[in-house]
């Protein structure tokens, strides 16, 4: 089932807001919990509850370890943010329509803080956050920067304001 229905980690072709298509991957998407689903199926079969009046009862949702927004079309749904790394622009879509867009600067490549391409879900949103770089042997950090908002989507990578960056 997982090889047929999982979308997490798979390559997908998307049409960019600025035009053209690109292929993206990432951890976002549907992912069946194979161990739990196997156990659930074994229980259904052994208990006989998968049969009713001689008919197979196949309408059930698998056990997922991760769910996406939609099973139709783009599994991230119609409300999402697109960050165009090449064009250095961010777009906010609501119900498939652009409701906000702005220029942006992505990770500082010269300092090895690149922004990865891919599809991710936001982990949480936070205001007034201090972002810290790697911890140095003396216990201090490579950098400490205050941001007004922070929305991580891939570990220590996320969307935030960056008053110290202009390009």
Identify the residue ranges that each predicted region occupies:
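Glycine-rich, acidic and aromatic/proline-enriched surface loops and short helix-turn segments
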Residues: 150-164
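Surface-exposed, secretory/extracytoplasmic low-complexity segments enriched in Ser/Thr/Asn/Gly/Pro
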Residues: 1-120, 124-145, 149, 164-165
């Amino acid at each position: 089932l997982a090889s047929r229905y999982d979308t997490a980690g798979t390559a997908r072709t998307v049409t960019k807001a600025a035009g053209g298509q690109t292929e993206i991957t990432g951890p976002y998407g549907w992912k069946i919990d194979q161990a739990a689903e196997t156990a659930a199926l074994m229980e259904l079969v052994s208990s006989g509850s998968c049969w009713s009046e001689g008919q197979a009862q196949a309408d059930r949702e698998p056990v997922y370890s991760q769910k996406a927004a939609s099973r139709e079309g783009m599994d991230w749904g119609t409300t999402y943010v697109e960050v165009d790394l090449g064009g250095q622009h961010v777009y906010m879509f609501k119900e498939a329509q652009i409701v906000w867009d702005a220029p942006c600067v992505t990770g500082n490549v010269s300092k090895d803080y690149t922004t990865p391409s891919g599809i991710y879900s936001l982990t949480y949103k936070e205001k007034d956050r201090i972002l810290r770089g790697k911890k140095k042997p003396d216990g201090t950090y490579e950098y400490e920067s205050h941001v007004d908002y922070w929305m991580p989507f891939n570990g220590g990578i996320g969307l935030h304001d960056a008053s110290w960056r202009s390009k």
